[in-house]
Amino acid sequence: MPRTPSLPQSIITAQLNRVTSLSGLVPYSTLRKSAISKEMARDSFESTEDLQRRARNAPDGAFLAIDFVMVPHAGRTMEGVNYHYSGQAQTRLGHQFTSAALVQFGEDPVPLLERFKVSQALHTEHYPYRTATQEMIHVVQDCLAAGVPMAGLLLDGEFGRDAAVTFSREHQIPVLIRAKANMTVHFEGESLTLGALSKQFPPDRCHLYAEFGWRVRRLSVAREVGGFDVLIVWRKLHGEWTRFFLFSTFGGDGTVRSLLRAWKARWGIEVIHRFFKLRVSTPAGVVCHMTS
């Protein structure tokens, strides 16, 4: 007797066949549309139990990576969302999601959370508008409340630098964040941007980390919120040295090599985003099953 496919299997099969709505999913499942919606609602990224269950799949010593992903609409409407856009628009509109994952160098990323990040225009009591930094803090607090273990936070450049440092110290959670070249710091009695600081430390004045092929200089700097470390990272792209910057509150507990490995591990959340972007044009509930 053939085995009845589970709902997650039905969803995956449907999406492989380019299905982009709940209505289109029905022929691939033994359930009706209303029953599919109810089943999806039982397994969400929002509950404490879900966070705990997903976190159990992560390796020891994993870092919590938080980022945003924009998922474009599949057509003129997105089922279940009262939002339309002009077919004449030059830019395809979509919805922004907040995502979080536990990542570790050399290990598969473990998705923890995915939810809509609403605009000010769509603000409601149940779906409040938050800035990027407010959203990051909210996600971390949810994970802490669920007892999700984390060795530290890995954040991209859209999150507020000073607010992230303050939050890091208040909660004793170290952070590693990409910094922009125009970020101003105090270094050896001088106030200058990271871009200007990097000119004092070109590649030949930085240590080579052969594992990555990067040249890195770690410096102690300060801002109004206090002191922290900045990593000037030089890497070759198309034969030319280019630099990016990371700032860290890990202090002496993190070696440069371990910080670089942590940042490399952050790519895991980008891998998850590729999965979202390729397959997610349907309601958010579908994602819950596909990443389970």
Name what the model sees in each region.
Residues 21, 47, 290-292:
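Alpha-helix N-cap recognition
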Residues 21, 34, 86, 248-249:
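Short linear Ser/Thr-Pro motifs
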Residues 32-107, 217:
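Active-site-proximal, Lys/Arg-enriched surface segment
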Residues 25, 100, 175:
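A residue-level signal for conserved active-site and pocket-lining positions in enzyme catalytic cores
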Residues 20, 95, 267:
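Conserved active-site and cofactor/substrate-binding residues in soluble primary-metabolism enzymes
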Residues 1-2, 8-11, 62, 109-292:
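Single, function-defining residue in the core of a domain
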Residues 1-43:
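Gly/serine-rich nucleotide phosphate-binding loop at the start of the catalytic core
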Residues 17-20, 104-110:
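Short helix-capping/linker segments at secondary-structure and domain boundaries
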